[in-house]
Amino acid sequence: MKRIDFENGTITGNILGAALPMLVAQLLNLLYNVVDRIYIARIPGEGTAALGAVGLCFPLIVIITAFANLFGSGGAPLFSIYRGKKKEPEAVCIMNTSFTMLSASALILMVIGMCFARPLLILFGASSEALTYALPYLMVYLIGTLPSMLSVGMNPFINAQGYSVIGMTSVAIGAVANLLLDPLFIFVLGFGIRGAAIATVLSQLLSVVFVLYFLTKKSELKVRLLHKDEIPKCINYAKNITSLGTAGFIMQITNSLVTICCNNVLSVTGGDIYISVMTIVSSVRQLVETPIYAMNEGTSPILSYNYGAVRPARVRKAILVLGMMILAYTAVMWSLIILVPGTLIRIFTSDTSLVQDTIPALNQYFAAFIFMDLQYIGQTVFKSLNKKKQAIFFSLLRKVFIVVPLTYLMPYALHMGTRGVFLAEPVSNVIGGSLCFITMLCTVLPELKRMEK
């Protein structure tokens, strides 16, 4: 079984070796998420309304994913750092701690979500009509919280051991299953929007079975739940996992907060149609960001391993390669969004009126997207090198302190209406992205220079 050699392989080769399978995995994962929306939008007579309703479920789905990444992406860099230090027993303990926290939090979130699904959807901006579609979808989706969180949260530990192709395969299993099951449950069996959720849950179940089979039977370092007597000695690991994962957690939770704020403002200033517009804009963003996420996550274990092994030159080169790859990709995608926005929008809807409403919104939202690269690069470096405070601060800065206030200020105080909601994003990209990247350059590069001495 081929593994990436973090110890001796070239930096560019290692990054490509990790990022390319992860890119395929993330594109498949995107397909996993987007295919629901494509099929839902084409349900006869109710597609547009149902699509907007699924958009109302995004905040809670994002919260579930955020908890998966809190313990998964929080644990994997520490796991890699300890592997770089040749401390494998500690690395295994970190992985087992993450697995235990993922399992416990998934069960808690499922129960809370099911108990409060209706009031949460109303809080997120659901009208009485939208609620008839959103509530059935969400209730079924919540049943799959445990397999969803384990498949997402444990996959980074497969990649951190160098098995990027296996990590890709675990995602592919779920994505292909979802692609096949969606039309069966939505159209053939006539379950409509509820059928999309059933297909997703079954697909997640298949994916997690593969992940756990590999990590318990085939991988070099194997996972299991913590025993009761092991919990006290793993408390410090749990604290470190949580604190390191908090940055990504905050980014996803604040994404959810921004979605709630946007939906609330758009429902007042533009009506339910603009919630559907925002759902499509968010879907396009997810499409564009997927390869960036793959590059970040592919580079992260390489940064962490070499930082733990005290190899500053390799860390510095990995940062440079990551930056060049992300900037080149974003320049191409940004050009496509500006020049042919309708092509991307029509992936998600065939409603001509909805396409026309979405085109200006998409152009406004992505006006300064290239600045977001600076945030991605800075955050990936901070997380991979265990720089918890910086990672958390810049996660909060862009979303909580810039986007959320502007989402209310621009439409109401500046009388920009729906346009103000979409323009809040590029303003935050310029300010937050620039500050994050400059701080990374001023703190990390001097530290790497000191390590050489």
Describe each region flagged by the PLM.
Residues 6-38, 42-46, 59-74, 78, ...:
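N-terminal transmembrane alpha-helices
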Residues 23, 27, 31, 35, ...:
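Generic alpha-helical transmembrane segments of integral inner-membrane proteins
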Residues 27, 31-52, 121-128, 184-191, ...:
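Helix-terminus/linker motif at the lipid-water interface of multi-pass membrane proteins
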Residues 72, 141-159, 167-178, 196-211, ...:
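Short runs within selected transmembrane alpha-helices of multi-pass transporters and secretion channels
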Residues 17-36, 140, 174, 203-207, ...:
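Transmembrane helical elements of multi-pass membrane transporters/channels
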Residues 17, 40-62, 129-133, 193-194, ...:
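Interfacial/gating helices of multi-pass transporter permease domains
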Residues 1-19, 79-144, 190-245, 303-368, ...:
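Short alpha-helical transmembrane segments in multi-pass integral membrane proteins
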Residues 51-111, 148-167, 263, 275-335, ...:
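Small-residue-rich hydrophobic transmembrane alpha-helices
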